[in-house]
Amino acid sequence: MKLIIFTGLVLFGIVSLIEAQAENEKACLPQYQVCTDAPGNCCSNLVCDCYGRYKSGARIGRNCFCLQKGVIYKRED
């Protein structure tokens, strides 16, 4: 009986370790990819920058993209 419990605990530990490792190896989002629903998934040299969308002064949405850290984007007319 103790052997069965011990085996179960060992298997549970192995499965938990595999799941944690798979979680850490998730593919990151490359530059210019949308990160609205996953702000923490941009690659390490990128940051998830969000911008509000407005129409006639009213906010109609929000867009987020993986962009380079420290870079400022300006609108060109």
From Swiss-Prot:
GO terms for molecular function: toxin activity. Contains 4 disulfide bonds. It comes from the Eukaryota. It is found in: Secreted. InterPro entries: Spider_toxin_CSTX_knottin. Its main location: secreted. Residues 1-20 form the signal peptide. Expressed by the venom gland. It holds the Pfam family Toxin_35. Belongs to the neurotoxin 19 (CSTX) family. 08 (U8-Lctx) subfamily. This is U8-lycotoxin-Ls1v. It comes from Lycosa singoriensis.
